[in-house]
Amino acid sequence: MAKYSNINSFNALQTLTVGSSNYQIFSLTQAEKKLGDIAKLPKSLKVLLENLLRFEDQLSVKTEHIYALAEWLKTRTSDQEIQYRPARVLMQDFTGVPAVVDLAAMRAAMAEAGGDPEKINPLSPVDLVIDHSVMVDHFADDQAFEENVQIEMQRNGERYQFLRWGQSAFNNFSVVPPGTGICHQVNLEYLAQAVWLGEDDGQTFAFPDTLVGTDSHTTMINGLGVLGWGVGGIEAEAAMLGQPISMLIPEVIGFKLTGKLQEGITATDLVLTITQMLRQKGVVGKFVEFYGDGLADLPLADRATIANMAPEYGATCGFFPIDEVTLGYLKLTGRQSDRIALVEAYSKAQGLWRNAGDEPVFTDTLSLDMSTVQASLAGPKRPQDRVLLSEVPKTFNALMELTLKPAKEAKERLENEGGGGTAVEATKANIQHESPSCVIEGQEYPLNHGDVVISAITSCTNTSNPSVMLAAGLLAKKAIEKGLQRKPWVKSSLAPGSKVVTDYLLAAGLTPYLDELGYNLVGYGCTTCIGNSGPLPEPIEEAIQCHDLNVASVLSGNRNFEGRVHPLVKTNWLASPPLVVAYGLVGNIRTDLTTQPIGQGKDGQPVYLKDIWPSQAEIDAVLQKVNTDMFHKEYAAVFDGDESWQAIQIPKSKTYEWADDSTYIRHPPFFEGIGEPPKPIKNIEQARILAVLGDSVTTDHISPAGNIKKDSPAGRYLQEQGVEPKDFNSYGSRRGNHEVMMRGTFANIRIKNEMLGGEEGGNTIHVPSGEKLAIYDAAMRYQQEHTPLVIIAGKEYGTGSSRDWAAKGTNLLGVKAVIAESFERIHRSNLVGMGVLPLQFVDGQTRQSLNLTGHEVISIRGLSDGIQPHEILEVDVKGPNGVASHFNVLCRIDTLNEVEYFKAGGILHYVLRNLIAS
């Protein structure tokens, strides 16, 4: 059977000759003769159009779907569902391990049903990069990297053996070993090709490189002109197994960039500005495409930084078309010359090349003159909350005022007791200015609100960008020369996304200065950005906990959600790598770095940020040290791994041999009874509310990735299995064990359940008894009582990481529906993919306007009649006082394909049932 379309309704199949090579392409220019003028389509939509032409089969891709993309130009929007097939899949290990567990479980289910387990195999290339498991246990010394790698291998040996089994058992499945880099940076520097090649019937086809990834920051690759975005692991698994991505033709927001960044302004400042602008615009579920003459001078690394943060500005992707800058980067990073020639020829032939003055048709537009961008951070709790560098102290002080302001009833009580306002103010002042001390390396230091305890150069967002990395090194050099040192209470680290970074820092002579300040290499992986910051020194943790200090982290990452970076660090600030180092020097965020000194130099004079900030000319001079040989050297053996990786013993079987005593890899229950027909969809009757949550509940809140508390349900389970707390590892590393993960669902210590008055922590009220329980324990009691459950929430439910366990855990707790004001794209899809119904309040109603307290009984009508996309359903409510009411909700099953997945119990159930039937 042909892999690509042999229907060719639009006579698009043509031969493209580049040099001495011939390639088959589905020509958009040829298709235009039937489709009409499509030249003005956004280039990101042209990629989708080519995909439909190539996979036209009159079943999943029909002529009408192809015409719908051309018709988009008339209305600049569409309600047409299409079936999109990306060329490949990218994974990291936190999401990759549970995905491979699912594939292994599907093989077991296939064998149990009497089928061939090897039918469960990726049909398109899958690359899994192990980058999420390294933690910053050791830092600020020359041995930190080796020690952290050793601990990583000890902690994760079982997981890594499982991944090595997967690499040997599945076709089209490659693993990049630990200690190599971050998946998105490895993708940018090596895996991505801009134009992909495929063989069919003895011929070579050329087409746009496209992908989906099991990490929300897969979007980074759009900086290279490669269309890609994050999906949940379950959706990625379905894509691997040949299931198309079901999607509506998106709206495309054009973002025009003009001008140039001013001296001293970084790509980080630019991306934080863009993130704020697009969040205010509202681009959830939409493509963003960048255009304008400003792109001509915007380096590829800056484009990748902007594309990386698409999840933070809410878009499906932030796409940069291919141009001369793209070709220059492909050449720098060592891509083959014939592939670079093909990228240029193909892009120009297909109208995918960016020409000066291009003005595609967009749904809507906004623009930014880059010369207006100012030095910025984002914080303290959301990446879209940009704060000018000069405003950081004021922002923090305002936060502290709110934090320390006594409650109205407490103030009234004090006044009635004769304490008056003075006592209240004195209490506030005491909390604000009390300076507990901590002993570090034998010396006592004060620790206060606003002190920086973590300063981390981390994350592919910025470590993929030589300009800001070299700026950090130059700032470190100037700081050392002035006689400055990092403050001793600051945990500092350098964790690049690629070994090339340390090569060019060393070649530029900057490594010794970073090391002297304590920014030694700690690993090649995500570390602090995803919460793998490791423990703080014990005296610092004790001081924070004893005095309830609001301390800070400053990191060059892309997310700063509450509780993500470190559970004891309440405020987190995103900043460029040189600013990360600057805050490590000053040691607090109360100092205005634009007007106040960072410290005192060895000459006794105050040193200001402007005294050590590198000029663009200085940065440009050391940028010359970045060369192609570095990329060739580091990627020549990218799949080989070190001796400890190669020494891992690999089981030889094609089906996985599950170990009953494993606490990392367990046979999940998702496919039990898969041989039986799916049960018909019924109304949800007499459900209880498990939790009432507010706005911006992240997938970190729902399924944390970081530390497992000893006294949590997951911690107690692990101790019952004989695991000591020091060996708990993290939730993220335990995602191959459903027993841990379901206990960790809604277990983030910063989640606030309104049923408990907004108290922090993963607890709830078991309504019939009135007992306060951990959410997991309450859910299990409800299951024993055969009571279905719902979650009530506010806006942006499920924002953040593409974390399929946020949906899997919700399913395993017995939650049948989530009713929210709005959903983030990936989590909504994941809920459907796990058979959980996403429902949206309508007509401006909210949990507050409906007076939902969590003590009601909920019934959801209209499901048993046959569910449809975007159907209005009725919710019946019975209050604790017996008063009945009802309200309507919008069913957020968005496509007909999703209806089929939901009816089957989930997307993987749908795929597996079809494979068993065949």
Descriptions of predicted regions:
Residues 1-918:
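Fe-S-dependent hydro-lyases/dehydratases of central metabolism
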